[in-house]
Regions:
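Bacterial Sec-dependent N-terminal signal peptides
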Residues: 1-24
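Conserved, mostly hydrophobic/aromatic
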Residues: 55, 91, 132, 189, ...
Length: 330
């Protein structure tokens, strides 16, 4: 067949495929969390699959009896669209809000049934694994759950027997139940390198996710916890926390990056913005996100985003900034 006889559409398709293959062939991960309720009704043509390697659907949690009542079938178009772009889809359990039902469900007897149900949903709806985001009260905090470790080990065993992934979202300093043996079960770990301060610490009115924090968190996982670099992913926030000018001032609500840059012209180029009445919003702008991406490419295996719907399209996009740095170094 002569090349000149091929239609232009063929070359456009070929170029698109090649670029996609280049994006996914690299071992560097770009992981994004995405709200599960929005995924169920998303216009998949507007989801930036081409700039991601993994999407975590947040959150999939059972009721007190261990039953999952989400409409998983409604996620099928989203999952298929992701797979078309070679993006893996994981169901994330837990979340920042306290999920007290897991304490009972992680106990002997109920734990095995919970794992069975999780694996069933993953296999039935062709997801790629489970992301464990059990936070305060389980993996860290004043109290932890003694069954966290055995749950992770048994979950990993069940998922890996089906060639599925098990990952985690863990804080800067996880609790003592997160042992080296537990850490070794995860295919990779998303370090939640944010919320170092916030409304709960009004005396620390500063950036909750500085570049310095990111360096310290990566160093802790590499040097203290001895986690191999190819299992670590650096988390970055697409939101900010605000503080008043004095300790007596009420803390203003947090804002998404989308809200910040849509309201204040030029806010994408800095890490804080002075709001009316003396308040200051602290977040990560494009330069810091690019610097963190460079840090991640040098020291760990990827970068994670909380969360994708907090971003904006176009030149102000933080995901675009991440992708520009990551693709330039591939």
């Amino acid at each position: 067949m002569k090349l000149k006889s091929l239609p232009i559409a063929f070359f456009v398709s070929l170029i698109s495929f090649t670029l996609s293959a280049q994006n996914t062939s690299s071992s560097f991960k770009i992981v994004g969390y995405y709200p599960i309720d929005q995924a169920m009704k998303a216009d998949t043509s507007e989801v930036p699959f081409d700039k991601l390697t993994h999407i975590m659907l947040a959150f999939v949690n059972p009721d007190s009896l261990g039953n999952f009542k989400q409409n998983f079938a409604a996620l099928t178009p989203f999952t298929k669209a992701a797979h078309t772009h070679n993006v893996k889809v994981l169901y994330s359990i837990g979340g920042g809000s306290y999920q007290k039902q897991y304490h009972a469900l992680l106990k002997e007897g109920k734990r095995q049934e919970l794992i069975k149900n999780l694996v069933l949903q993953v296999t039935r709806y062709e997801a790629d694994g489970i992301d464990v985001d059990l936070e305060s009260g389980y993996a860290f905090g004043p109290e932890t759950d003694p069954n966290y470790g055995i749950f992770i080990k048994e979950l990993a065993q069940s998922l890996k027997s089906k060639n599925k992934l098990v990952t985690a979202a863990l804080p800067s300093s996880p609790g003592n139940v997160v042992t080296n043996e537990v850490l070794s079960q995860f295919d990779f770990i998303n370090i939640m390198s944010y919320d170092h301060t916030g409304p709960w610490s009004p005396d620390r009115a500063d950036n909750h996710a500085s570049y310095s924090d990111a360096m310290d968190d990566v160093k802790y996982y590499l040097n203290t916890l001895k986690v191999p670099k190819d299992k670590l992913v650096l988390g970055v926030p697409f939101y900010g926390h605000g503080f008043g000018p004095a300790l007596s001032d009420p803390v203003i609500p947090w804002m998404t990056y989308k809200e910040i840059v849509s309201t204040y012209a030029g806010a994408e180029w800095v890490d804080h913005w002075h709001l009316p009445n003396g308040y200051i919003m602290h977040y990560n702008g494009i330069p810091t996100i690019k610097n963190k991406t460079q840090l991640a490419m040098k020291q760990v295996a990827g970068i994670m985003i909380w969360e994708l719907t907090y971003d904006v399209p176009g030149r102000k996009s933080l995901l675009n900034a991440i992708y520009q740095v990551a693709s330039a170094k591939k």
